[in-house]
Swiss-Prot record:
Gene Ontology BP annotations: electron transport chain
Stored NCBIfam families: fdx_plant (TIGR02008)
Name of the molecule in the record: Ferredoxin
Function: Ferredoxins are iron-sulfur proteins that transfer electrons in a wide variety of metabolic reactions.
Naturally occurring in which organism (per UniProt): Pyropia yezoensis (Susabi-nori)
Subcellular location as annotated: Plastid, Chloroplast
Assigned GO CC terms: chloroplast
Gene3D superfamilies, per database record: 3.10.20.30
GO MF, one example: 2 iron, 2 sulfur cluster binding
Subunit structure comment from the entry: Forms a complex with heterodimeric ferredoxin-thioredoxin reductase (FTR) and thioredoxin.
Pfam families on file: Fer2
Record text on cofactor binding: Binds 1 [2Fe-2S] cluster.
Cofactor(s) of this protein: [2Fe-2S] cluster
Record domain 2Fe-2S ferredoxin-type: where: 4-96
Length: 99
């Protein structure tokens, strides 16, 4: 089973951290295990509270039901139901960008 390096960034929140995440672990769960506090609400991919934007790398978020095709193409991700499929960099706390 592969582990990937996840780099989270949010200048406003003072977040600039890298941690390992297994390919079968949700990014939000792995961040919490590292003591990183990220926003979340439903934990089911049905809202936008945990939204991030992938700026490098790829994720698998097939379980999400909230983001539309344009948002997915733009790189938005719901960290509560996203598995890493490569090393990636994600900007966090971007929910307001979706509206």
């Amino acid at each position: 089973m592969a582990d990937y390096k996840i780099h989270l960034l949010c200048e406003e929140e003072g977040i600039d951290v890298t941690f390992n995440c297994a390919e079968d672990t949700y990014i939000l769960d792995a961040a919490e295990e590292e003591g990183i506090e990220l926003p979340y609400s439903c934990r089911a991919g049905a809202c936008s509270t945990c939204a991030g934007k992938v700026t490098e790398g790829t994720v698998d978020q097939a379980d999400q039901s909230f983001l539309d095709d344009d948002q997915l193409l733009a790189g938005y991700v719901l960290t509560c139901i996203a598995y890493p499929s490569s090393d990636c960099t994600i900007s966090t706390h971007v929910e307001q960008e979706l509206y």
